[in-house]
A protein has these predicted regions:
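Short, solvent-exposed, charged loop/turn and helix-capping segments
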Residues: 76-92, 109
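Extended amphipathic alpha-helical scaffold segments
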Residues: 49, 72-75, 99-102
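Short helix-adjacent coil turns
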Residues: 58-62, 86, 112-113, 117
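Short N-proximal segments of mature Sec-exported proteins
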Residues: 54, 61, 68-81
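C-terminal motif of bacterial Sec signal peptides marking the signal peptidase cleavage site
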Residues: 1-3
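C-terminal amphipathic alpha-helix
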Residues: 18-39, 104-150
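Immediate post-signal-peptide N-terminus of mature secreted/exported proteins
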Residues: 6-66
Length: 150
């Protein structure tokens, strides 16, 4: 009952907070030359990663929401099109982390809550995924491991 007695200004101030605080969102770093091999070896992940970079540049809430929906779909496609060389527990675990932060961002955005910390965590998860792919490549010097599946 005490919650109902709060002034309206206190209740509405929480819902008027900006959903995305762009000045506190890091941009997704670009792939360096050691990571470009992802483009040819796992096109579905590369497509997901490239579109993810636009999250920090969405000009409106509507476009941000549409981009989140698109990324959830692209992430699912990337997991279903996982190449044989990427069938590693470390890759699957990193993709689950990315999936979790992507869905947390979508949920908070739908609830009109700020999402800047989730976006930063999502970008960190994608960066960690990139590093895991490079480590996997470096640990396996067998050139046949990274030949595109046919």
């Amino acid at each position: 009952m005490t919650a109902c007695q709060r002034p309206v200004s206190q209740v509405s101030s929480a819902t008027n907070a900006p959903k995305v605080l762009w000045d506190s969102v890091n941009e997704l770093s670009k792939l360096d030359t050691s990571q470009v091999m992802i483009k040819d070896l796992w096109p579905a992940y590369f497509s997901f990663r490239e579109r993810s970079a636009y999250l920090s540049k969405a000009p409106s809430d509507e476009e941000f929401n549409l981009l989140l929906d698109e990324l959830i779909e692209k992430q699912s496609v990337a997991m279903t099109e996982l190449p044989n060389w990427a069938q590693q527990p470390s890759i699957r675990a990193r993709m689950k982390v990315v999936y979790t932060y992507l869905n947390q961002t979508k949920s908070l955005f739908g609830l009109n809550q700020p999402v800047h910390s989730e976006l930063n965590a999502l970008f960190m998860g994608i960066k960690d995924m990139d590093q895991t792919l490079v480590l996997l490549r470096n640990q396996n010097n067998d050139s046949l491991l990274f030949v595109q599946d046919t």
